[in-house]
Amino acid sequence: MNDILEIAAANQQRAREVIRDTDLEAIWRSVGAEANLVGSLRTGLLMKHRDIDFHIYSSPLRVADSFAAMARLAENPRIRRIEYGNLLDAQDQCLEWHAWYADADERLWQIDMIHMPVSYTHLT
């Protein structure tokens, strides 16, 4: 059990280093959005999967603002890849972003960002 807790603690520390290095929260604030940490990192259950999940809220949600934030994130040399999905006309009504960050040991971290209008804050 102690090994599991140690792994979780180490991964949480590394994940928070990724968030600091990418300046992710400030990047989203710069386009008028609020980034909220969700998922396994927030709950303290980050184990094997190196993933960081954010719900991003904007009012109004503008595709151009979302792209501007991701352009700034892409300037970080540790970002290896970014994927985009426009689900504004689907039930989810969001923009999906997935970025892969290589840490100092070249381990990839997946950063999932779901960009939604403020009216969807009741879903978190």
Residue ranges and their predicted role:
Residues 3, 21-23, 51-53, 65, ...:
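Acidic-enriched, low-complexity/disordered segments with a strong bias for Aspartate over Glutamate
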Residues 121-124:
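Conserved small/polar residues in nucleotide/adenosyl-binding loops
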Residues 24-67:
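Active-site nucleotide-donor binding segment shared across nucleotidyl transfer reactions
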